[in-house]
Amino acid sequence: MFNSNEGSEFARNQARFGGTQNPYEPEVGSLPDGGNSGADDEYVNKTGTTIVGLTTDDGVVMASDMRASLGGRVVSNKDVQKVEEIQPNAALSMSGSVGGAQSFIRSLRAEANLYEARRGEYMNINALATMASNLLRGGPFFRVVPILAGVDDDGGHVFSLDPSGSSLSDSYTAQGSGMPYALGVLEQEFTDDLSTDEAVQVAAQAIDSASERDTASGNGIHVTKITRENVEIIGHKDVDDVL
């Protein structure tokens, strides 16, 4: 039977990869395995994590728990700050590998600082989300699943990012191992006209709910308030201090 691909560049590439490479990859959402079988996962510090972000009537509120685990089985740290300022009107909250998260934050912050130095202004949040997703897609951050939030002339923004490079905007979101429990609270309690104080309460309830059921989340909460002027991050060893 005649094969239209015979002798074509497509066929030569198939032969070159010896059948081990899908010629249609990479597809949207697919990740390279990097030759890593996962054998070292038990030695990797992970934040396990519940992180949430939600817009308010004048900004954005984020919240995250404070627990890190080793291989998902042992609590390795009880005082981890999983949210960092990227620029004075934007912050990033992280779930996944601690090392990958720290490297990603440094890279994104450096790009934001370079943009400000060249342009004399902060990067708008949509552009910052695009930059973040491009870094995730092209860089060695395969175990990092962040939430980016910020406030610009168009109001508050919350973006869910993932290692495939996707960037999804919503009024509220959650990531991490405690996401199902946190999202249940956000679905029930979120409204479009929440004040900042009300949003803090909702975010704290979401973290508290996840900490009750998810063994990789707990040990306190960091609450982050973002406006057009500044990012304020406050830690509490007990979620009840916020509720």
Language-model features, listed with the residues they occupy:
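A short, polar/proline- and glycine-enriched secondary-structure boundary/capping micro-motif
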Residues: 71-79, 103-105, 169-172, 243
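Contiguous domain-boundary segments centered on the initiation and propagation of an alpha-helix
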Residues: 1-47, 86-87, 91-163, 227, ...
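A two-mode feature
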Residues: 2-4, 128, 160, 164-243
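Active-site cofactor/substrate anionic-group-binding motifs, chiefly glycine-
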Residues: 64-87
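A generic local secondary-structure boundary/capping motif
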Residues: 39-43, 50-52, 72, 80-83, ...
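Beta-strand scaffold of nucleotide-dependent catalytic cores
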Residues: 61-65, 74, 159-162, 235
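Conserved active-site and cofactor/substrate-binding residues in soluble primary-metabolism enzymes
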Residues: 46-48, 78, 99-103, 123-131, ...
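Short beta-strand scaffold segments in enzyme catalytic cores
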Residues: 50-54, 60-62, 145-150, 220-225, ...
